[in-house]
Amino acid sequence: MKKLIFVSTGRCGTKRIAQILRKYLPEEFAVVHQMPFSRLANVIGNLLFYLGPSDRVKRLLYKFIISSYCREKYFICSDPLTAMLIPKDFIDSADVCLVHIERSPEAFADSFFKLSRRRINSFIAHNFIPYWQIGIWPLENCISGRIKEKYVQVAKLKNKLFAEMYSASPNYVRIEMTEIFNSDFLSNLIFKFFNYEVIIPSNELKIKAN
């Protein structure tokens, strides 16, 4: 089963990517954005950053999370909450493509902060769930006057980690968020990796998911 996995810090257009691909690809493609247990995966992935990596934990949890989607021929995931948990056998596999999406750290920080103020679930996660984000401690989101600066550092750190962890993949791609939504990148990626031709109208790339 071929798998296309987008990894990112979040706030990188991954929800919109899933919406587009779900709309224009046939049913043999399982396209997911946020999966059950991915919030738990986010916390565990961040906790492993401090405790040290465990590929066994990553493999067991990640394969459990995606198991219900593996009935289709192809699997596409854009869930940023599972981005820290990709196991080594996925990284090394020629049947897995890892697309590392980057966004300007400053734009990420601004978007992330606004989301934490706009949605109650996001506010609760960012302020009351330990290890929800690397380097950010409970309540820091709402009491620190330098929180945006810290989110800038989070973005830089996570993108560095993703490059270190996943660049060994035979199908690793690193790309800016803006390029995805201003080019034929998605169509070309689907054709190159899955050998499936899909036409995505340019106007679809201009619509924001949230």
Spans of model-derived segments:
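A conditional alpha-helix N-cap/helix-loop micro-motif detector
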Residues: 55-58, 78-79, 155-156
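C-terminal accessory extensions appended to soluble enzyme cores
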Residues: 198-210
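A general structural motif
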Residues: 1, 71-73, 93-96
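PAPS-dependent sulfotransferase catalytic core
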Residues: 1-64, 69
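Generic structural signal for helix capping and beta-alpha/helix-loop junctions
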Residues: 38-39, 108, 208
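PAPS-dependent sulfotransferase catalytic domain
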Residues: 81-199
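Glycine-rich phosphate-binding loop used to anchor ATP phosphates in small-molecule kinases
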Residues: 64-88
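A structural signal for short, well-ordered beta-strand segments and their strand-loop junctions
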Residues: 6-8, 30-33, 75-78, 97-102, ...
